[in-house]
């Protein structure tokens, strides 16, 4: 504990400057000095922002809507760096937004993919109990799935499980036949294409620096980027993922829930071992910890990924160990909720960091259900950063969070925030979009 305290003090007092990343596009694509005016500006071009902008203009084609993204392409962060799983809705607390919107979103997603010709595979998922102590929890998941309205799930013994996955071992399993895989980055691009075709306007390389109250009574919100380009809007929807807390502060709204970035690192199975699985294979989640555990996931490109782990990222966009931002790290460590969470999950966090450095330890996690996989059968793969919302008491906020703060000034009263939309946010995106547009209609009288 004394060593941990010394490390925290060192990080808080360390002033090393983060090296500047070169080659990142920052120019505003519509040209300097543009003062476009919109009924609604959607900030954040991930899958939730893109789906919401699309739904808004589909439902209200008379509105002028902008979709604003700070990077040089859409789905740059969480939406383009994930496992690609189409979730069925088994894990989530009955009655929660996640449970309702995931089940609805899955059905909407498959219909949309078919309409647009987007490649996907309904390859299913096995949640496998490999120890006796996991079997009761597996039954609980089954009951939860039924309560959530997940279709066609069934409990299987080891013989039935092997009929689906011959190489998989376990005592019992929960089979979800409608779980699938897709490229969520491709889906996001399709949403954006729909939005543009309906008359929406997109802005890339527009990194929001501040919101100020404009003199115009008709367009009272002025959105300014890091190069002083301007967009004027009547109302704003923010879907900023990893930066949702910071963007909320810019509008005069509270920072909480605080976003803590967790990196999830994946391994690839080498191509000649990809045949070992054709479906998603997940462990029974341990209720003591907030993550689902290391699993096997086939990807739409034919490769199979193993992972992810879950380790603290040293900045909002910390995809590698060498990525860090001292100011952001100080803010993370200085947040009381993080310190409480870190104490609670210290053992788990240390083990995850060790597994990140020592690949065979991560492989051991999947050997519980496929013994043929060895350390020689994997190679380093992609990584993603999850935006985890956290309360002051250290509680991880698991459900989706959408809010507006009508009491927080002229700008805050005109903004709706998507504060927390982690997994299954992609699966739920079309359902989230419908709900968000209903909120916009109700709160902003559009």
Which residues does each predicted region cover?
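Glycine-rich active-site loop/strand segments that organize a redox cofactor
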Residues: 75-105, 115-120, 160, 313-351
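Beta1/beta-strand and adjacent pyrophosphate-binding region of the FAD-binding site
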Residues: 33-48, 66
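Glycine-rich FAD pyrophosphate-binding loop
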Residues: 57-80
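Flavin-dependent oxidoreductases
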Residues: 51, 211-326
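C-terminal catalytic lobe of FAD-dependent flavoproteins
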Residues: 336, 341-446
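Short beta-strand to alpha-helix junction loop
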Residues: 93-104, 128-137, 175-196, 203, ...
């Amino acid at each position: 504990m004394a060593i941990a305290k010394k490390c925290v003090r060192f990080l808080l007092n360390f002033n090393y400057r983060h090296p500047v990343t070169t080659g990142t596009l920052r120019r505003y694509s519509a040209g300097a000095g543009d003062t476009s005016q919109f009924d609604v500006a959607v900030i954040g071009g991930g899958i939730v922002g893109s789906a919401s902008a699309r739904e808004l203009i589909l439902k209200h084609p008379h509105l002028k809507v902008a979709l604003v993204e700070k990077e040089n392409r859409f789905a740059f962060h969480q939406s383009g760096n994930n496992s690609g799983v189409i979730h069925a809705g088994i894990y989530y607390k009955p009655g929660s937004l996640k449970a309702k919107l995931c089940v609805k979103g899955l059905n909407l997603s498959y219909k949309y993919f078919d309409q647009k010709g987007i490649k996907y595979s309904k390859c299913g998922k096995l949640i496998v109990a490999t120890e006796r102590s996991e079997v009761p929890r597996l039954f609980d998941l089954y009951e939860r799935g039924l309560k959530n309205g997940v279709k066609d799930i069934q409990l299987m013994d080891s013989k039935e499980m092997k009929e689906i996955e011959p190489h998989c071992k376990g005592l019992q399993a929960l089979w979800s036949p409608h779980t699938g895989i897709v490229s969520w980055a491709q889906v996001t691009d399709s949403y954006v294409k729909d939005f543009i075709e309906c008359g929406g306007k997109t802005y890339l390389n527009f990194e929001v620096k501040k919101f100020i109250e404009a003199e115009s009574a008709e367009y009272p919100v002025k959105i300014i980027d890091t190069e002083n380009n301007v967009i004027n809007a009547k109302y704003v929807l923010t879907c900023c993922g990893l930066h949702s807390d910071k963007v909320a502060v810019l509008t005069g709204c509270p920072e909480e829930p605080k976003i803590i970035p967790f990196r999830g690192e994946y391994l690839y199975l080498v191509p000649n071992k990809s045949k070992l699985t054709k479906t998603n294979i997940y462990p029974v989640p341990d209720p003591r910890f907030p993550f689902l555990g290391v699993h096997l996931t086939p990807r739409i490109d034919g490769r199979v990924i193993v992972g992810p782990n879950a380790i603290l990222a040293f900045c909002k966009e910390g995809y590698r160990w060498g990525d860090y931002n001292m100011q952001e790290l100080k803010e993370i460590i200085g947040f009381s909720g993080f310190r409480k969470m870190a104490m609670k999950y210290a053992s788990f966090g240390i083990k995850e960091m060790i597994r990140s450095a020592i690949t065979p330890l991560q492989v051991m996690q999947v050997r519980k259900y496929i013994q043929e996989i060895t350390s020689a059968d994997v190679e380093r793969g992609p990584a993603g950063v999850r935006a985890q919302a956290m309360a002051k008491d250290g509680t991880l906020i698991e459900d989706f969070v959408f809010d507006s703060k009508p009491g927080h000034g002229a700008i805050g009263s005109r903004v709706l925030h998507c504060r927390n939309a982690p997994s299954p946010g992609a699966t739920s995106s079309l359902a989230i979009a419908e709900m968000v547009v209903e909120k916009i209609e109700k709160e902003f009288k559009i």
